Amino acid sequence: MIVAGHETTANIVHFALVELATNPAAQRRLQRDVDAILGGRAPEEWDYETTTNALQASMVGASVNETLRLMPPVVSIPKEVSPTQDQVLNISGEKHLLPRSTYIDVTVSAVQRNPRYWPTRPSRVDPSKESDIEDFVPERWFQTGGAGPANLQEAEVEGADTEDFGGFAGPDTSAQLYRPPRGAFIPFSDGARSCLGRRLAQVELLTALAVIFRSYSIELAVDDFVPGTDAGDEKVAAMDRKQLAGLYRKAQENSRAVMATASTRLTLKLHSKNHVPVRLVKRGEERFVSWVDEDA
């Protein structure tokens, strides 16, 4: 537990920042929720019971969950039937016998992208696709048409602390967010041997995003898409809205293409020279994310 999240949590924060830079409308909604929940309070004034639950039920929690859905740290989880007895699984009313010592590989990335278990709509990223199951859409986690609970301060995380040495027994999401069927959302595995540090990881993720987005915005760097190599900032400053939107669209397309190359070496991450350059800017000084995709 001392080093919990050193690799996995850091990767999820990284992926979440890139996704939010690639999807400015989601980032703006997240910042509105952060402002509503935290006001002007400094991090040292935040309270675990009220602040964490409110963040979990907001666009912050939805963004964390959506990142975990699309980019789970561990894409494949090994399981094994007890060596002492067979096990019977009841799936959709049918019983399936698993012989003792059977090795099972649970493919997290597949079940979490199965449209059978998730709210979907036609893709805004690729209009030719009937489903946005492959897209980063945090709003799918809200049960009321893309809006969070009316009072974020009174949000609950049902079962959040029902954790013992036998494994966390509660759900992975806020009581106010969409609840996929058991087994459809398993970034922390499931059952008696699920991740003991899941609640710690969730708090770390929520806090990291809240600290960043209360003061800053994340934008995709567009340097590689500005013609010429000199005076890039000056060229961008001289562009009109239509040109800026086209420039940022190129960065968005590149970001999605690079993110699709993520692969596993112990955990899921970008490797070799694959990376998505971003800019950290103070809120109010954005060039793109304050208005790009306003119709989303």
Residues of each region from the PLM?
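Cytochrome P450 heme-binding "Cys pocket" and the immediately downstream C-terminal segment
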Residues: 24-27, 180-181, 190, 194, ...
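A structural signal for well-ordered alpha-helical segments within the folded catalytic domains
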Residues: 11, 15, 58-65, 179-186, ...
